């Protein structure tokens, strides 16, 4: 292996998914902007915040929603049917 090709800031980082309230300690060189968090072992680690991970993403959790676009269109038409009929009478 070539010497001096690896990053100098390779350290243990806490990746924390705030929506699932779950975290993982991983060695990484990801930028953390100096944020820290005390983990369950009582030690303070650099923090990398995640919005979504495999613990919270609907594809991985099985809580996926199917959107019925036909139902949405019919609800829209029902709500504004009276408005459209009065508009047509005026012309």
UniProtKB/Swiss-Prot annotation:
Q: Which GO terms describe its molecular function?
A: structural constituent of ribosome
Keyword set, alphabetical order:
Ribonucleoprotein, Ribosomal protein
Q: Does the keyword Coiled coil apply?
A: no
Q: Name one GO biological process term.
A: translation
- The question of whether Oxidoreductase is a record keyword is answered with no
A matching Pfam family = Ribosomal_L31
At the top level, the lineage of the source is Bacteria
Q: By its UniProt entry, which Gene3D superfamilies does this protein fall under? A: Ribosomal protein L31
A single GO cellular-component term from the record reads: ribosome
Membrane spanning segments where? Answer: none
* Family note: Belongs to the bacterial ribosomal protein bL31 family. Type B subfamily.
- What does the subunit section of this Swiss-Prot or TrEMBL entry state? Part of the 50S ribosomal subunit.
Q: Spell out the NCBIfam families in the cross-references.
A: L31, PRK01678.1
Quote the protein name from its UniProt record: Large ribosomal subunit protein bL31B
């Amino acid at each position: 292996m070539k010497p001096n090709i690896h990053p100098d800031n390779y350290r243990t980082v806490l990746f924390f998914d705030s929506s699932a309230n779950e975290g993982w300690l991983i060695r990484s060189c990801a930028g953390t902007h100096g944020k820290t968090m005390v983990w369950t072992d009582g030690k303070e680690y650099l923090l990398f915040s995640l919005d979504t991970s495999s613990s919270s993403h609907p594809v991985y959790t099985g809580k996926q929603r199917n959107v019925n676009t036909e139902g949405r269109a019919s609800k829209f038409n029902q709500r504004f049917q009276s408005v459209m009929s009065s508009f047509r009478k005026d012309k």
